[in-house]
Amino acid sequence: VLLAEDNAANQHLARRLLEKRGHAVTVVANGREAIDAVRCRRFDVVLMDVQMPEVDGYEATAAIRAGETPGGRRLPIIALTAHAISGDRQRCLQAGMDDYLSKPIRKEDLYDMIERWGAAPADPQTDHGPDPQTHATEPGDALQLAAVDLARLKGLAGDDPDLIGEVAEIFLAESEDLMQAIRDSLAEGDAETLSKAAHSLKGSVANFGAEQAFEAARSVEMASRHNELDGLDAVVQTLAEQVDTVRHDLERLLMAKEFSE
């Protein structure tokens, strides 16, 4: 499986879920790298994020299709998108993609999609779900979390405490840099960089079901995409406060028993 995704947390989550299922995974961070990877080796399926730097998923798909031999094998390409917008699926299909998977990605949806398109796992029984003893205690459930939806996070990660912890740690490591990029690009009037940073942050907080942080990030992304930066300072401040709340929730989760060895 070729995974083309620029968000570090989403990369890690999808790769680990696929590897648990028995799939070999190659990860690239933009469309140009995806095109090069397909030219160099054969893949069963491509998972293609539609919004990536340098070359986006639509452009990469068009280039891959242009390189295919007429009448020859058609490489299945599955779009990954955070856009829950009517007509988005049709745009993906028109671009030459074969199917569509909405982010944040759920384990069952991911497995069903790639195996429907021909990427058979090395061992279909590899992922049996969590060991029953992991449900003996649920200290994470006892925590009163202000922003993070633990049930959604467990659903995304297949109820795997290790994977939940890894995704949380990635967010804690990258979210401060993303917020700083958002502040700096707003101060400099750099709408393009602002939009990209807000988009990346939006994709990360979606994994945790942090709706207020997600909406704030989406507002910043949409405004900057249309170069409407006036009045964004207050929205960015709200976003920073919501991200801090998510970070606090995740730090508490990492300290809870079910996320420790």
For each of these PLM feature ranges, what is it?
Residues 99, 106-261:
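Two-component system phosphorelay core
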